[in-house]
């Protein structure tokens, strides 16, 4: 009988130079959740895509493989809470995966079904788990930071076990009527069919899904006051709910902006929620992606108990402070320029705020505003479902003829 291999403790294993290959069958494993943030404008979205390597998940995958926490991306039972598009940021984003462990005696730690007894590494009873956060941050780009981890059940799914998601969207106050925006925002609270507040393509899964979502809370708050010009004060929209549809927050922002600009009344929200009045979505544009952040993903406390370590947290805060200081310095530089330039000519109310509105609307502001009641309508959900059914039927008939 050969003796079991001895594995050093967690600290020594991190310091030692890892071999290029690792026998994963010799090591126990556990399912963990990680909590992380990323700056969306630096990446091409969260989810892996064939045409780019600069997605957040691709960087995380590479980090997990480089640190020998996983052997194969397709076999680690990966799940993420909320999908974010290119340009959209996240804080307290959550993902779960099965990784290598140092603690075979811990609850939730298990061995592969393929592992033989003689293959198992004999771990010293250090009681210390691998420093997952430190290991991942050591190889991730600085625009992606992990700041907490938690042991979770093998059945845990970061998406389906999430019971509350919170988004934040920041924009300049400009000349917006915040009180009217708040009145409109309150009408979003509750369980509604939000099909007029999202994008619906010909994806079969999206066509067949329910468009009913429950919004718990919506707030429109002025979060900073500019000392020289109130139009540069910052406002934040916060929306919490059970889940959200594709581009739902960005469409909500567009509508609230028009209400704030007093082009529409707050009652427009109720009208768009009434599918008898608006059986399909009026044509209106999508708000800019950069100000949007998936701010929080909530779970039951019995499902997830986050572990945060002071050293890694302090390091993350220091790095984020440097990034914040960089953008603040640039912002102040531009404020000085704007102050000088706007003093050189007389601006109408509309011209003075034009750039602030166009940034959020992500398009030039039209000279003649068209009210929602007079706009062309998008194709209805029912019409798209009928087209999809017809397409499938024709495809089946073609197959039968072959």
From Swiss-Prot:
Q: Per the record, what is one GO cellular component?
A: nucleus
Which Pfam families did the record assign? PseudoU_synth_1
Under which main EC class is this enzyme filed? isomerase
- Reactions the enzyme catalyzes: a uridine in tRNA = a pseudouridine in tRNA
Q: Which InterPro entries match?
A: PsdUridine_synth_cat_dom_sf, PsdUridine_synth_TruA, PsdUridine_synth_TruA_a/b_dom, PsdUridine_synth_TruA_C, Pus3-like, TruA/RsuA/RluB/E/F_N
Q: Give the protein's biological function.
A: Formation of pseudouridine at position 38 and 39 in the anticodon stem and loop of transfer RNAs.
Entry protein name:
Probable tRNA pseudouridine synthase tag-124
Any one GO MF term held by the record is: tRNA pseudouridine synthase activity
Give the span(s) annotated as Disordered. 383-402
Report the sequence similarity comment from the record.
Answer: Belongs to the tRNA pseudouridine synthase TruA family.
Which domain of life, per UniProt?
Eukaryota
Q: Which organism is it from?
A: Caenorhabditis elegans
One GO term (biological process) = mRNA pseudouridine synthesis
Catalytic center residues: 85 (nucleophile)
Q: Does the keyword Oxidoreductase apply?
A: no
The UniProt record lists the EC number as: 5.4.99.-
The record's annotation in SUPFAM superfamilies points to: Pseudouridine synthase
| UniProt keyword list | Isomerase, tRNA processing
């Amino acid at each position: 009988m050969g003796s079991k291999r001895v594995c050093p403790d967690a600290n020594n294993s991190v310091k030692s130079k890892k071999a290029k290959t690792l026998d994963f069958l010799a090591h126990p494993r556990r399912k963990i959740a990680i909590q992380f943030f990323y700056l969306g404008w630096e990446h091409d979205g969260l989810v892996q895509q064939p045409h780019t390597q600069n997605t957040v998940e691709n960087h995380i995958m590479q980090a997990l493989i480089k640190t020998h926490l996983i052997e194969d991306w397709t076999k680690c039972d990966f799940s993420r809470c909320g999908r974010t598009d290119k340009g959209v940021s996240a804080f307290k984003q959550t993902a779960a995966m099965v990784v290598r462990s140092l603690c075979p005696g811990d609850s939730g730690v298990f061995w592969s079904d393929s592992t033989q007894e003689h293959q198992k590494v004999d771990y010293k009873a250090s009681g210390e788990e691998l420093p997952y956060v430190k290991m991942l941050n050591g190889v991730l780009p600085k625009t992606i930071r992990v700041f907490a981890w938690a042991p979770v059940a093998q059945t845990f799914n970061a998406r389906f076990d999430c019971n509350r998601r919170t988004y934040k969207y920041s924009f300049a106050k400009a000349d917006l009527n915040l009180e009217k925006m708040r009145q409109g925002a309150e009408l979003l609270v509750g369980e509604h069919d939000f099909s007029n507040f999202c994008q619906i393509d010909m994806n079969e899964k999206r066509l067949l899904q329910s468009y009913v979502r429950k919004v718990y809370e919506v707030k429109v708050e002025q979060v900073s006051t500019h000392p020289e010009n109130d139009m540069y004060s910052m406002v934040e929209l916060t929306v919490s709910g059970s889940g959200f549809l594709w581009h739902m927050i960005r469409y909500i922002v567009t509508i609230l902006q028009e209400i704030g600009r007093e082009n529409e009344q707050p009652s427009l929200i109720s009208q768009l929620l009434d599918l008898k009045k608006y059986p399909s979505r009026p044509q209106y544009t999508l708000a800019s992606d950069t100000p949007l952040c998936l701010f929080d993903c909530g779970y039951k406390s019995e499902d997830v108990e986050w572990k945060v370590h002071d050293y890694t947290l302090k390091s993350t805060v220091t790095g984020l402070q440097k990034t914040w200081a960089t953008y603040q310095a640039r912002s102040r530089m531009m404020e000085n320029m704007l102050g000088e330039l706007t003093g050189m000519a007389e601006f109408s109310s509309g011209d003075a705020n034009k750039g602030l509105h166009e940034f959020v609307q992500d398009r030039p502001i039209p000279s003649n505003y068209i009210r929602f009641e007079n706009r062309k309508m998008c194709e209805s959900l029912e019409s798209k479902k009928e087209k999809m059914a017809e397409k499938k039927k024709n495809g089946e008939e073609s197959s039968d003829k072959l």
